[in-house]
Amino acid sequence: MNKKLTDYVIDLVEILNKQQKQVFWGIFDIFSMVVSIMVSYILFYGLINPAPVDYIIYTSLAFLFYQLMIGFWGLNASISRYSKITDFMKIFFGVTASSVLSYGICYAFLPLFSIRFIILFILLSTFLILLPRITWQLIYSRRKKGSGDGEHRRTFLIGAGDGGALFMDSYQHPTSDLELVGILDKDSKKKGQKLGGIPVLGSYDDLPELAKRHQIERVIVAIPSLDPSEYERILQMCNKLGVKCYKMPKVETVVQGLHQAGTGFQKIDITDLLGRQEIRLDGSRLGTELTGKTILVTGAGGSIGSEICRQVSRFNPERIVLLGHGENSIYLVYHELIRKFQGIDYVPVIADIQDYDRLLQVFEQYKPAIVYHAAAHKHVPMMERNPKEAFKNNIRGTYNVAKAVDEAKVPKMVMISTDKAVNPPNVMGATKRVAELIVTGFNQRSQSTYCAVRFGNVLGSRGSVIPVFERQIAEGGPVTVTDFRMTRYFMTIPEASRLVIHAGAYAKDGEVFILDMGKPVKIYDLAKKMVLLSGHTESEIPIVEVGIRPGEKLYEELLVSTELVDNQVMDKIFVGKVNVMPLEAINQKIEEFRTLSGDELKQAIIAFANQTTHVE
């Protein structure tokens, strides 16, 4: 019964996040001091004569000074199963110093207590404050040794710096399967030191030898800014050893206490190996743009559209209209958003952007302040086989959205474009180039503001290469690459969505914003990294070359040489100087395309798109 009660109490405390724990133990500490001063007085004088205000003054001062000292030492009245004897000594010195300092102040005005009385108070306070901390470690140790379920995984932590210290401080759940055996750090000088009572055993290079010696089953990387090449090296060593490799969650989620101890570490993913830096949202500018407004997103069930909805939700718009053609994807995104965000009116709307009357009815009903147009057909080989659908959705659909924005007097429209719109050899890229022309054409004649945002591939989106590689690896291979020389620009879905929202905030006059995608990545190198992440080697999962598919290019471009970059509106967002065509001329071409089909339509769209790419 006692064991169950202690388990219940500990688990109850562990539900609290870091800040709540500090408040909880702060209350316990002041209670300990109040009890100590009362017991001390009774033991010395037999009864309580002074007025309660005297106790309040002395105890308040002592607790205030104690908290300042503990906070200065970084203990913050917390409890850790990794607490060292030095931490307990700091608590003792904190109680002693705060008590003596408070005594000195009170003695000048309220000469109530003797030195012997203060000594007794210090001893009692220290005992009561330390008791739960020591008990915590003992109970954890007994629970761990007595579990007998074989589930505790012997683990190495990579990183003895700030990330490692934060990890140690945050992962304190007594039922965790985490059994930290030692720490490895790039700095060999740290060998022999301890972090939270756990020894630094060596450097990364020592991982193979030390992992075998200590029978390690798992490695956790606690270095938020670790270089991608170092990630690869650690993964390669872990794969050879048959050891699972994980990473610490994002620092902000650990600091905020959003992860349960022992369950928050994550698998290393492809973004860690590509090393893209996350962009932060400009809260002040976007707050003005989005807060309290109605936002409409087309293609809201897709990878980019749904992420735009998530990012916009952080700025508390009044309403987000989730417009899409696929009811299942809209349903899933809608229910995800209403679970994650409160106080926002999410409106799921099933509509086809090829139906202008339906679009206009929705726009006039909800009166959005901004329309993010993410709906499009994006798969290159599929559109090569279905050029009519590419025309109807990407060209006619975009025209309908832009026209409805103008007719309903929506203040702003932001269209998602692609690097495949530059010198397009395929239907998909050509239709997106024409869509850019539609947006800039409407901007010339409408009171609404229009812009387009052009970027490359997004990691993990539906139809992208990452899910294909994952499926092929899960099936045992081979992983297929069209051409070992092929390169692509890559960006994460959250990063692309953030930049789209930022670019939209800077839109003034029909700009085509171009996102800085970093350096292009070889698809072959990407495939090798995916195999590495799976825990396999290329001998186990072969990578084969299968040839370029219809409409594909070896190398993608974000702009042509004549699309001079006028200026950079912010980090990673440039404004491209692109050709603008009168809307009447675009309408004529669209009517011409409507009469064509098959290869004739394909060639006509591609030819027109390439003619209009270059700046006059």
Where on the chain are the PLM-derived regions?
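N-terminal Rossmann/SDR dinucleotide-binding element
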Residues: L258-T271, G275-K367
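Strand-loop microenvironment adjacent to phosphate/nucleotide-handling motifs in alpha/beta enzyme folds
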Residues: K21, R280, R285-E289, G441-N457, ...
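Proline-aspartate-enriched helix->loop->beta-strand connector
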Residues: A211, Q215-E217, P317-E318, F363, ...
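A solvent-exposed beta-alpha-beta segment
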Residues: Y45-N49, I139-V255, N328-L332, R339, ...
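Conserved Rossmann-fold NAD(P)-dependent oxidoreductase catalytic core, especially the SDR/UDP-sugar
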Residues: L241, Q256-G257, H373, H377-E436, ...
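Hydrophobic/aromatic anchor residues within beta-strands of the central parallel beta-sheet
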Residues: P348, A390, Y450-V453
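Signature of alpha-helical transmembrane segments in polytopic membrane proteins
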Residues: M1-G150, K240, K247, V371
